[in-house]
């Protein structure tokens, strides 16, 4: 299964979310190929810390040019995850045919391919959208995200209509306390989004929490049993998302609390 994270709006946590989902799936025992198509390089840096600073020959640009991942993957520092590192050479191949990535990805060997894309819309992003079995767009509830979500929807319908049914959105930077106030900016934009888009995963609310930065910057794990509310909510959100993509039914204990395959990741 190929999962593409795509958002034209930068700063919504797209790369971190891709990492969190990939790590949760890997912790469940699935074999993951992480394909970093974002020239910001943050996912590559996260997965290859302590391995190498640059990958001049093993990278996404070389893989796309030669239409194969064989010889271009790197074993990451996280068990069960290999990565095709990002490269600034992506700028040189922006005119590449949008079928290239689909021809490049391996048919077997991995349970999931997770693709991180740049916050833009070009042929490289089209490659990632076209290759996807599931497209995930994190949205922060504001006017800028509404505008870019409309833009992405229009381009999907115009250029990749067969992928529209595979596209889903979910809320990020969610503040649970604001749910109590119907006139809060969050609540008002949630109503606008839900009126205009029918593809919102309302059960996925990625919280606004320092635990997100700690996860990628200090390797501090998140846990559904954490005493820190932010860590707990982050772990729950990505367990729910992992359950959706793996089609795993969420179980509950006798008190109605959700039970997940992975407590800590």
Where do the protein language model's features map onto the residues?
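P-loop NTP-binding core
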Residues: 1-265
